[in-house]
């Protein structure tokens, strides 16, 4: 029988096991996380390149923030530890040479961007082709088994209802025998009701047992099909993990100023930490904790659950009185965020959910390392107070303002830049509706 299929309707999920209906979605989400992690790693390298041009204090702040972002993000295992090793290195380094910036942006950043473009293919309707293929594969593998599971649940419910009805019919018949006012015809009807209820019990029990047996017979094939799709997802993730390890090692080489004696020990330790990254070990961990290695409570024949249901119904009513008005929700504790020295410091895709431009230049308006006048009278840290001509710009990416003084716009929108980029990478601008606020400078381009 053809038709649309929703694996989340009509089936009770009793655990978080991979084998439960719909629980494969965590594996599918990992594909989207892989694309997101590419953005995060590019952002990480992009920020590191900027930090190469400023003082050790800013480098330390970068390391602190990114260590927290990586630890809270979806990356896991030995690759996560290898990634975090860069932050440990940054905390130990007081300053780095400016030529490192060129290698980070022109080689490593571009390599990740190109790999991401080749590995993930966007669809016109949104999402990625790789995610949809995994979703469709799991759905197809689970659909027959989920259908039989729904039949088991329905048969179990019918059987338990028949058992309950039989008990009630027997109870009525027993009570009627002690009632002298009841005529024989009424008694006969009650006896017939008992007989019919017994037949219903036998019939529903047989159907319950049959559907459960069919489910058991379908389970091996279900497991095989699900395992096959899961392994395809594992192979895709393995490519990403190995690529991340490769990129991290290349970044390490660019950062390793081996001609400076004080840096030798730092980078020797960093290389050792990265080389401990093991994709096989990470995949094995994911399999055991999020995949087929998880345990599963397979459905078993339950004879008297209807009786327990009656007791639970009463218990739930009483408990509800005590728990009315108490609601637990997921709370995003913004207070747990790491405090930043500046409200508009550069952010990661976890904080602003942003993408990054294909081109990047170190010619920043407030660059503390930019050349001054010949006399040396200009302080590179003085704020530029000269008037700025307003310029029309076009948004390259979507941006959702996170603070009251930030603008929100969509890719392709036009706005007016009112002030040049500040030292944190923000510009002041005005939307066509008159709203004035801040926005990331690298999210727009001048209109030619």
Swiss-Prot record:
Instruction: Map motif NPF2 onto the chain.
Output: 379-381
Q: What is this protein's function per UniProt?
A: Regulates the morphogenesis and endocytosis of caveolae. Lipid-binding protein that is able to promote the tubulation of the phosphatidic acid-containing membranes it preferentially binds. Plays a role in intracellular vesicle-mediated transport. Involved in the endocytosis of cell-surface receptors like the EGF receptor, contributing to its internalization in the absence of EGF stimulus. Essential for endothelial organization in sprouting angiogenesis, modulates CDH5-based junctions.
State any GO BP term from the record. negative regulation of endocytosis
Source species, please? Gallus gallus
**Which positions fall inside the SH3 domain?**
388-448
Residues covered by the F-BAR domain: 11-282
Q: Which Pfam families match?
A: FCH, SH3_9
Name the CDD domains for this protein. Answer: F-BAR_PACSIN2, SH3_PACSIN1-2
Family that this chain belongs to = Belongs to the PACSIN family.
Q: Which gene encodes it?
A: PACSIN2
Query: By what name is this protein known?
Result: Protein kinase C and casein kinase substrate in neurons protein 2
Post-translationally, this protein is described as follows, namely:
Phosphorylated on serine residues.
Q: GO cellular component annotations, sorted alphabetically? A: caveola; cytoplasm; cytoskeleton; cytosol; early endosome; endosome; focal adhesion; recycling endosome membrane
Major location category of this protein: cytoplasm
């Amino acid at each position: 029988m053809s038709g649309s299929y929703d694996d989340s309707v009509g089936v009770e999920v009793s655990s978080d096991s991979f084998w439960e209906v719909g629980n494969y979605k965590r594996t599918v989400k990992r594909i989207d996380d892989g694309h997101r992690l590419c953005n995060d790693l590019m952002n990480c390298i992009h920020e590191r390149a900027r930090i190469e041009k400023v003082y050790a204090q800013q480098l330390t702040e970068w390391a602190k923030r990114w260590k927290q972002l990586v630890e809270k993000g979806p990356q896991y295992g030995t690759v996560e530890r290898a990634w975090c090793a860069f932050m440990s290195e940054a905390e130990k380094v007081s300053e780095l040479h400016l030529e490192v910036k060129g290698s980070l942006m022109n080689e490593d950043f571009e390599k990740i961007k190109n790999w991401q473009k080749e590995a993930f293919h966007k669809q016109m309707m949104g999402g990625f082709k790789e995610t949809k293929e995994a979703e469709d594969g799991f759905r197809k593998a689970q659909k027959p088994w989920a259908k039989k599971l729904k039949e088991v649940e329905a048969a179990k419910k019918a059987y338990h209802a028949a058992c309950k009805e039989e008990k009630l019919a027997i109870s009525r018949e027993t009570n009627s025998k002690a009632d002298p006012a009841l005529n024989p015809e009424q008694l006969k009807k009650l006896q017939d009701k008992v007989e019919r209820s017994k037949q219903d019990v036998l019939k529903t029990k047989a159907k319950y047992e049959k559907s459960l047996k069919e489910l058991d017979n379908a389970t091996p094939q279900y497991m095989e099909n699900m395992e096959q799709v899961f392994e395809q997802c594992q192979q895709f993730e393995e490519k990403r993990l190995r690529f991340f390890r490769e990129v991290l090692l290349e970044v390490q080489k660019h950062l390793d100023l081996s001609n400076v004696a004080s840096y030798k020990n730092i980078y020797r330790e960093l290389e050792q930490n990265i080389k401990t990254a093991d994709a096989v070990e990470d995949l094995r961990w994911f399999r055991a904790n999020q995949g087929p290695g998880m345990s599963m409570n397979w459905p078993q024949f339950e004879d008297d659950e209807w009786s327990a249901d009656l007791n639970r119904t009463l218990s739930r009513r009483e408990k509800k009185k005590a728990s009315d008005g108490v609601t637990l929700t997921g709370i995003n504790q913004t207070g747990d965020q790491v405090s930043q020295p500046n409200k508009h410091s550069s952010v990661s895709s976890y904080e602003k959910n942003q993408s990054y431009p294909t081109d990047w230049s170190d010619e920043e308006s407030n660059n503390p390392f930019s050349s001054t006048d010949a006399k040396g009278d200009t302080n590179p840290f003085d704020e530029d107070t000269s008037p700025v001509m307003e310029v029309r710009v076009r948004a390259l990416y979507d941006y959702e303002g996170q603070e009251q003084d930030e603008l929100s716009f969509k890719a392709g929108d036009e706005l007016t830049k009112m002030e040049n980029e500040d030292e944190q990478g923000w510009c002041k601008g005005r939307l066509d509706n008159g709203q004035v606020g801040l926005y990331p400078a690298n999210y727009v381009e001048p209109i030619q």
